[in-house]
């Protein structure tokens, strides 16, 4: 599993960078699905940074920090 340096985790947790337009990839079972980051938000219950991903097939999903970093990394590896 991808582990970003601690200083990156602290910065992202305090103020999520928009990352709008970044491409991501996520593995669902045995199929890779691609999408783009379309926005950011903060979880009102726990204050966690969230990034909204709009998949190429039209689905939407919110990612937490560790998930979005892994998805960006996977896209880079597959490109």
Map each language-model feature to its residues.
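Eukaryotic chromatin- and chromosome-associated nuclear factors
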Residues: 1-79
